[in-house]
Amino acid sequence: MIASALLALGLAACGGGGGDTPASGTTPPVSTTPTPTPTTPTPTDPTPTDPPTVAGTCDLPNFKQDLLTRINALRAAGASCGSSGTFPAVPAVGWNDKLTTAADGHALDMANKNYFSHDSQDGRSFSTRITNAGYSWSAAGENIAAGQPTVQAVMDAWRNSPGHCANLMSANFVDVGVSCRPAASSSNTYSKYWVMDLAKPR
């Protein structure tokens, strides 16, 4: 199941963000006692560990890069989007962490509460979620999907749906953020919940 929404030139509150650069100014203590040489050799290669799980990726490998590659290949080629029309090639979009935050919040909410809609159950629209994530937009759109197991499967579904395809091909959008969340329970309607937010800054 897939759904799309598009909103352009709406009003949105300006959100900002900043970062702190940590500073360190400690001086190591001076030792006058010699340190004994260890008798057990230290391995030069650390013990391999499993890669950390990254939230919002459904544990799919190369999630961000795979999505950007597929989205931008479609945009570079141009596309016929059925009843939404034919779109010429358009510039690539870039990954945006604020849009990803907005997308992830909604994907997680749908996965936890077992629903599928552009509107959150508390009434927030995708444009409100994007604004609340700190992205000041002049154009915004959203694609959602549920049940697709892979990046390729969800991109194929969006590509083959006129409204979703039109969002993917819109020259109005320059940034994208995507999230996938697994169902919170085996009783959920779908196994995975996908959200793609696209936008252009103000």
Positions of the model-derived regions?
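Disulfide-stabilized extracellular recognition modules
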Residues: 22-25, 137, 141-202
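Bacterial peptidoglycan biogenesis and beta-lactam-recognition machinery
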Residues: 81, 116, 164-166
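Short, surface-exposed glycine/acidic/tryptophan-bearing loops
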Residues: 96-149, 168
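C-terminal motif of bacterial Sec signal peptides marking the signal peptidase cleavage site
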Residues: 10-13
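Post-signal peptide N-terminal segment of mature Sec-exported envelope proteins
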Residues: 22-63, 69
